[in-house]
Amino acid sequence: MKKIPALLLALCMIFALAACGRQAAPATPAPAAEQPAEQTAAGEPAPAEEPAPAPEEVELVVFAAASMTETMTEIKAMYEAANPGVTITYNFDSSGTLKTQIQEGAECDLFISAAPKQMNALDASCDAEKNPDGLDFVLQGSRVNLLENKVALVVPEGNPKGIESFDQLIEALKAGDILFAMGNSDVPVGQYTQKILAFYGLNEEELASAGKITYGSNVKEVTTQVKEAAVDCGIIYGTDAFSAGLEVVDTATKDMCGQVIYPAAVLKAAKHPAEAKAFLDYRTGPEADAVFESVGFSPMA
């Protein structure tokens, strides 16, 4: 009988040692992959965050006067860098040619003319004198006067004929000993030149018949003729003279040819009118103004 208490005592000691061993063993953390997923308040796994959608790809088609080629190319790079997904496609030419292309159905979101005349002819808000065909291509409320330019008399390097003013140009034309370049009659710079000749009382047709005038289909062609010294002088915009490195010997006054205003407008048939308006707004901001002013434009909007 004395063996039973001893046996019970031994069993108690064994159970006590086993319990101590269980308490001393450190807990093993579950592998990271087995950790419970984050849950919502309802106890369900939280949905994974979806990546932000890529910006919609937009191609803006902009028709702009040839005299804006350098500045608008620089602004394109600035705008596209700040607006991923937007691509600007330009069509540079004379404002008269661009107007005709718009009339014939060419795709265009935004039109910038080198003179009000071409824009007026597309704007239904203009009277019959300015818009004789009653065309309606301009989105109402979008039109702004964007820039002002100057009409300049320029000469080739070295100024071989010594022309230093419009007054001297007129005297040389009357004497018939000069070859002079100007834009065609459907080109704004040509129309401004016609006003200057009329201001001085000269007959353009007689001068052309006498072989004293050569023509360019846009301001860039006139600029090239002077740059290459194919003529003795020419009339272009001050901004084109700056970009081409030509010497300006005189600048026309408002009395001579009027104010040189560049209007801009979104077109009614624009595929992306909101984006076109945003681009137009950008071009009236400080970054674009700095580019325009660097070549001689005067921002108006």
Model regions and ranges:
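Positively charged n-region of N-terminal signal peptides that target proteins for export
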Residues: M1-L11
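Alpha-helix termination/capping residues and helix-transition junctions
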Residues: I14, E104-G105, E228, P273
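C-terminal motif of bacterial Sec signal peptides marking the signal peptidase cleavage site
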Residues: F15-A19
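Exported/periplasmic ABC-transporter solute-binding proteins
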Residues: G21-A41, P47-A81, G96, A115-P116, ...
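Hydrophobic anchor at the start of a short beta-strand
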Residues: I88
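Short beta-strand-centered segments that line the small-molecule binding cleft or hinge
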Residues: K99, G105-G134, Q140-N145
